[in-house]
Amino acid sequence: MRNPALSIDVDRPTSRHVRQNAHLLSDLLIEAITYLEGEEKAELVAKARKAASREDVVNGDAPLLDHLFSDLTTEQAVFLARAFASHSLLANIGEDVAGRRRHAEADAQPGDERPRTLIDAVKALKAAGKSDAELAKIFAAMNVVPVLTAHPTEVRRRSMVDRETEISRLMALRRHHLPPDLEAEIRESLFREIALMWRTRLYRPERITVKDEIRNALSIVRTSILPAIIDLYGDWTGKIGQHGQLAPLLKMGSWLGGDRDGHPGVNGQTLKLALSSQSRVILDWYAGEVRKLWSNLAVSTAYTPVSDELLALAAQAKDPSVHRIDEPYRLALELIFDRLTAVSQKLTGAPVAFASGVTSVEPYAHPDAFVADLSVIIDSLERNGGERLVGSALRTLVEVAKACGFHLMSLDLRQNADVHERTLDELFRRAGTGVEYLKLDEDARCKVLIDELSHQRPLVSPFTAYGEETSKELATMEAAAQAVRDYGHGCLGAYIISKSATLSDMLEPLVLLKQVGLVWGGAAPRASVKVAPLFETIGDLENGPAVLRQWLELPLSRTILGDRPVQEIMLGYSDSNKDGGYVASRRGVATGASALAHEADRMGVGLQLFHGRGGSVGRGGGPAAEAVLAQPAGTVQGRIRMTEQGEMIARRFGDQPTARRNLDGLAAAVLMASERPIPKRDPKVEGAMTALAQSSFEGYRALVYDDAAFEDFFWSVTPISEIVGLNIGSRPASRTASRKIEDLRAIPWVFSWSQARFMLPGWYGFASGVERAGLSVEQLRDLAGNFDFFASLLSNMELALAQSQMGIAARYVALSPDKANAERIFATIRREHEAATGLALAIRGGAALLDNQPDLAESVALASRSVDPLNHLQLELLSRRRAGDIDEELRLAIQLTVAGIAAGLRNTG
């Protein structure tokens, strides 16, 4: 079953730990199945696993396994799909536990690797000659924001993820030389959790709602991300706080409840729900911390003086107890707690945790007032020798409050530019302006929009009835305006404009936001929320700098951006990949980023890039810190936002230690990348990279868009139709009802190729591009050695090549009814895969894929051993379905294989 392109050293310590964990969890799964289902079904699982272990499953040659699967009843197929999917999930847990152990051991050993924590990055910069003043200036501008999105690549239910988390926790308790009774107790607990997992549905019977997505994400935020942020600010406050303000350094963002692009279920109500739910999480934490401080600071004025400001604050408390009349810190904290309760009542409709009931005090009008009260306590302690009485807890609370406010995560709004155009067209018509907006050319549109921003007169009338789409847009924007009034300006992140291509695309939402008071028109327009264009296609990425220049040349852009102007721009990895292939997409994003940074710098404006990455290589996936360090020099500037979506949220942030490691590593990478000098690039290097990107673009387009048979090939050889029916997200899979590749969303596009094990978006076009561009291996080696971007591109492509299995993919090709075209197209794909693999190894000088990354190679091999049999089972079931079997149980079995393969591969979208 081993991929012949991979080489695994089974004697490595990590490899031994992975195998030991996998064997234990596999044995416990069989034990649970035997206990719950009986010997006969357990024997069926054992028989299937034995057949899989003895055959060349990875190359599609598995007659014993195929024969076994062909004889299965539909009920047995459902059962085996569950068993293999569960085995795959447990194997991942075993690998993750071994990986955390490896990370812990590596952290304990001094080394010469790049800084992986912010504190180490600061030390490295100080060692390189940076002064405290220079570091303070850097920190003042830093803004690192991972943004959680609900893109549908997480197939598992929250209940299943919670079960896996508990299994992982129990596995982490296992150590060498445990007392036998404790070892037995842990094993029994593991058995119980695995048995419960077996009886838990892997995926949802009904399509998930936006409300579910908000709740699921907040579960991870509450249990791991927020505690990790608190820990980090606790460390940073004590060790690097002297270098400047920390609060802007790390924040969280979200699209949950605010991303309307192609999503009919997102509206003003989901926006309100998201912010209210987020608020409850952070206010409860604030309240808990204030209660702890109240318990500790029973400090009497009989023994220490306090500041007049603290006495004034304490005098406002409504505590009638005579026993605390000489304890002003407690009285002040009592007041703060009551005001937090009042805030919670106002924003969420319920008091905070630990509150005894409804309070009558005034709520804080904004988070700054909460921070100000806490600062009074800090100041009094410092001035009277009591700073060490509460350690770093109070300062950490202040820093977290500055970063999270009353909203926890800033919520972005996103909508498609086409919707803005249609909405404005109706508003202009209903207002009787005589403007037929949709008929105007670009120059005329900009003129009309700029004129609308030059005065305060609205287009909207409360006495006019608008169409459904326009009414929904206005209601959502009104909800956003109310949110700013309730939570403060920090509650909204950016207004993202999908399909941005022109200056008018940036101006349109400003005119719409003006209707609800989030933009003020006049000679010097102002805005409470900033607009951010999303450049998604190769052409739009190339044209992005020109759009930015046109925007910044408008006088109104300067007043809208404010006194410290920073323009945010989002770069789309997913649609640009679907548009032009892996190499052209990555090159387009990188060159676009550099050109945007140059343009912003030339115009005297800061730039914040927002990277719309997914989990898979084809959608910009890979370790976030490495991705930051691979960004072109001069494009990070201390500021970055990156999407964290689907299955990657649980993988990167599923437990507190992992969340902390990834967030700390991301912050460190941003700091180091920001201080990297811009190199003088050899024109020959740039020319070679440009030629490769263009030629790979042409090769990719020749297959995907120019071959008339390719569209049918895609729909017939991948389980795209079955994926559309799987309830893994609230968003529709396609923007329209058509089967065109152009209309399909990037996520199901990538997801489908992953299921059939092509991984095509992560590598196709590279080899043919090299050939078309006439580049030699020596030239490519020179590129990789002198160009971090190209080295990163190759590294990620090598992972996609290792994950792809052409033997299994060939079996999916056999599903196509058009045999001649299917075999012709697949021959092209297979040749490209073989050539890309050969080039990747030749450039690096490797003997096998990933042999320079043994942990990653083992991870891929482990996933393959678990997932390959599921592919064979899926193939059997798809054959039955497409032969006309419409049994509902068969559909369930297919969807179980889809869920199992996705969960096993872990970066499918």
Swiss-Prot record:
Gene3D superfamilies for the chain = Phosphoenolpyruvate/pyruvate domain
**What's the catalysed reaction?**
oxaloacetate + phosphate = phosphoenolpyruvate + hydrogencarbonate
A Pfam family of the record is: PEPcase
| Enzyme Commission number, as recorded | 4.1.1.31
Q: Which cofactor does it need?
A: Mg(2+)
Give the residues annotated as coiled coil. none
**A GO BP entry:** carbon fixation
Record keywords, A-Z: Carbon dioxide fixation, Lyase, Magnesium
Keyword Lyase assigned:
yes
Q: Which GO terms describe its molecular function?
A: magnesium ion binding; phosphoenolpyruvate carboxylase activity
In the UniProt entry, which residues are flagged as the active site? H151, K578
**Any Gene Ontology CC annotation:** cytosol
Per the similarity annotation, which family is this?
Answer: Belongs to the PEPCase type 1 family.
Give the protein's function.
Forms oxaloacetate, a four-carbon dicarboxylic acid source for the tricarboxylic acid cycle.
Q: Which NCBIfam families match?
A: PRK00009.1
* Name of the protein described by the UniProt record: Phosphoenolpyruvate carboxylase
What is the organism field in this record? Answer: Caulobacter vibrioides (strain ATCC 19089 / CIP 103742 / CB 15)
Report the gene name. Answer: ppc
